[in-house]
Amino acid sequence: MTITPQEALQRTIEHREIFHDEMLHLMRLIMRGDMSPVMAAAIITGLRVKKETIGEITAAATVMREFARHVEVEDNANFVDIVGTGGDGSHTFNISTATMFVAAAAGAKVAKHGNRGVSSKSGSADVLEALGVNIDLQPEQVAASIAETGMGFMFAPNHHPAMRNIAPVRRELGVRTIFNILGPLTNPADAPNQLMGVFHPDLVGIQVRVMQRLGARHVLVVYGKDGMDEVSLGAATLVGELRDGEVREYEIHPEDFGMQMVSNRTLKVENAGESRVMLLEALGNKPGVAREIVTLNAGTALYSANVAGSIADGIQLAREAIASGRAREKVDELARFTQQFKR
């Protein structure tokens, strides 16, 4: 028997779990626009208050993937998504976007799934536009971009049209809900490997186990203990790693890789223009904190993509990709390739 929205709401009020098949049904109602905004708002708020379970998040992500416009990638060896939940409040430049260029220059294929800034001063879509990249591509054009340049940016609104049914509710609520953690779980290119940053330490263990249930191959979920949704230079980083079906949780420190622990304060930006400048300086091999944090994250992404056998090996490859100028060249390559699809 299917659950009604009213029954689901009662379940959340009593702090009881909504089971997998029930959650599939509820999410399909939301994504089709068949649930009233009042009930949708009540349920997603109730889930947040009770705390979403791994099973509930897995079911919700499964439905979001069902409704997505997919990008078909033929060869998914060394294929990785580099993404953050956002919402860490750090207002740093776009580290994961810079990481994409370095990882691609070092031999990974990257399908980056992102959006405009909501909580940040500059989302991945904003800085890519500032770099001259056309972000408004159709799924088959993104696939061509990945095949040709080793990189593809999937602008979330183009791939999740059903989200428009819940967008006004989310906007009016103005608080974090399950949808804030679903984005990184719903890559439209189905990248089997992932470096995922999260905004809360509890999400490290949760998100990596959701990815395990969703059938991912090699995933590193990270949370910098200074609050960053990246691998941090300013503190230890909590890691949840899925590899060969097994989950391991551990901490890493910059010193483990011969790097100095240094505050991330200098990485703050006010807008996409400032983010662009800092990103290009890092990729241009300008010594400093920006280059180091991009190197650290790219090394981790290359390990996740199975291009490198360890994070340390990945960092070495990332250093070479930046020093050789290949990482900086990737920016112009992506801009050139995507501009041909300008509508």
Swiss-Prot record:
One MF term in the entry's GO annotations: anthranilate phosphoribosyltransferase activity
Leading EC class: transferase
Domain of life: Bacteria
Pathway(s) the chain acts in: Amino-acid biosynthesis; L-tryptophan biosynthesis; L-tryptophan from chorismate: step 2/5
Cellular-component GO terms for this entry: cytosol
Reactions listed under catalytic activity: N-(5-phospho-beta-D-ribosyl)anthranilate + diphosphate = 5-phospho-alpha-D-ribose 1-diphosphate + anthranilate
UniProt entry tagged with the keyword Glycoprotein: no
Keywords (A to Z) from UniProt: Amino-acid biosynthesis, Aromatic amino acid biosynthesis, Glycosyltransferase, Magnesium, Metal-binding, Transferase, Tryptophan biosynthesis
Residues where 5-phospho-alpha-D-ribose 1-diphosphate binds: 84, 87-88, 92, 94-97, 112-120, 124
Named cofactor requirement(s): Mg(2+)
Cross-referenced Pfam families: Glycos_trans_3N, Glycos_transf_3
Annotated residues for binding of anthranilate 1: 84, 115
Cofactor, free-text remark: Binds 2 magnesium ions per monomer.
Function description: Catalyzes the transfer of the phosphoribosyl group of 5-phosphorylribose-1-pyrophosphate (PRPP) to anthranilate to yield N-(5'-phosphoribosyl)-anthranilate (PRA).
Protein family membership: Belongs to the anthranilate phosphoribosyltransferase family.
Subunit structure: Homodimer.
Name recorded for this polypeptide: Anthranilate phosphoribosyltransferase
Organism: Burkholderia thailandensis (strain ATCC 700388 / DSM 13276 / CCUG 48851 / CIP 106301 / E264)
Origin organism lineage: Bacteria, Pseudomonadati, Pseudomonadota, Betaproteobacteria, Burkholderiales
Gene that this sequence comes from: trpD
